Amino acid sequence: FARLGFADANRELVDAVIAEAARFSETVLAPLNRIGDEVGCKFDPATGDVSVPPGFKQAFDQFVEGGWTGLTNDPEFGGQGMPAALGGVLTEMVDSANLAWGNFPMLSHGAVKALETYGEDWQKEVFLKPLVAGTWTGTMCLTEPHCGTDLGLLKTRAEPITDDKYSVSGTKIFITAGEHDLVPNIVHLVLAKLPDAPAGAKGISLFVVPKFKVARD
């Protein structure tokens, strides 16, 4: 890894990270695998709230406390800056032990990478840091009832309100980790079209839609 620019990722450190990831997956996540299948998430139609299976939140809290949510992310935003290959090892262990649980941090990872690459500076400050820290989670909202993942046909619209604010309306389905009680806020990255967008996939834009609104500062 040193030849790839990861000077701190020596053999001793990498081995220690892998060993701890294995311990966490085996002793914390694997025992919850059956519970995830038998109990699953619970939806309360009266409130719209979703609760995760017993033990899932406690496991997620331990995952966050261990710094795993930021393992491969940029240190500028609170990450540890480890190689993506090491993150792949972690993901394989987590998902092998408990795939249902592993879907929660998996979607956050995708949201983090999108914001790192394309987010504005204020978006990185407001949304990226809590996602890397694991105090919030993220999703990717693509699929719609009428077209599945044929994104060229999506109908979700974003109407401009001000120069940097939009009113987003539409219906998304099959959103992994779209609602839960692991953290107080969920950052949804939503694919939608502006009123003057060209037809097809080329007219799609990406919008940051948090479950609860937050101020820039």
Where in the sequence are the language-model features?
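Internal maturation/activation junctions in enzymes
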Residues: 36-37, 44, 104-108, 116-160, ...
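Beta-sheet entry/capping signal
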Residues: 61, 67-70, 100-104, 137-139, ...
